[in-house]
């Protein structure tokens, strides 16, 4: 009798876990008007690792958080390069830029200092398990075998969809756009974000 009860209870528990996990995986992407989840993460600026705090950044002004799939891949390289080119204009608007991907900090140390990409102009943060992305309602895709970056190196981390959140200094999301939903290019992410922070 006890054995049957135990097995039945275990099945119910397992089913509840599956339901909970499914709900987490299908969480809705945050939108305009939502409070931006604060986070801290290991990040890199100009090849040097440091601890980035969204709370600290917001104390200085608006923040542009741009999630991207991977360093050293076509669209992400273009996006980083465009942010670097327009960094002074974001600074003039009082805004902080932070990129977030699942790349490990070693890759980001290289990417953040590469003159062709981030060029030491703004930091990029590591979210290796997609925990930050998940709090923003983004889907974290597990690693895929056989994918290589523009340098020919295998990409072993998971992926976060290209999505940009513009957050005002009160911590409220004032704009969000994604390549998947809005069908915009990596460069357009940057241009739209700049136009919004200028208007704040």
Predicted segments with their positions:
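Bacterial N-terminal signal peptides that target proteins for export
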Residues: 1-11
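Bacterial N-terminal signal peptides
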Residues: 9-20
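Chalcogenol-based redox active-site neighborhoods
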Residues: 23-200
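General N-terminal leader/first-domain-start detector
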Residues: 2, 21-24
């Amino acid at each position: 009798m006890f054995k049957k009860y135990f097995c039945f209870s275990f099945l119910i528990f397992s089913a509840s876990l599956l339901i909970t996990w499914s709900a987490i995986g299908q969480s809705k992407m945050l939108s305009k008007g939502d409070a931006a989840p604060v986070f801290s993460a290991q990040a890199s600026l100009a090849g040097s690792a440091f601890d980035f705090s969204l709370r600290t950044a917001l104390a200085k002004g608006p923040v542009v958080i741009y999630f991207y799939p991977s360093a050293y891949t076509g669209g992400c390289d273009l996006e980083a390069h465009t942010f670097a080119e327009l960094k002074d204009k974001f600074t003039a608007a009082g805004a902080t830029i932070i990129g977030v991907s699942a790349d490990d900090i070693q890759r980001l140390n290289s990417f953040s200092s590469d003159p062709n990409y981030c060029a030491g102009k703004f930091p990029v943060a590591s979210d290796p398990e997609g925990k930050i992305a998940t709090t923003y309602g983004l889907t974290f895709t597990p690693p895929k075998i056989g994918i290589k970056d523009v340098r020919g190196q295998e990409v072993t981390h998971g992926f976060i969809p290209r999505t940009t959140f513009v957050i005002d200094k009160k911590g409220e999301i004032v704009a969000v756009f994604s390549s998947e939903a809005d069908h915009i290019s990596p460069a357009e992410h940057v241009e739209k974000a700049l136009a919004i922070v200028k208007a704040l």
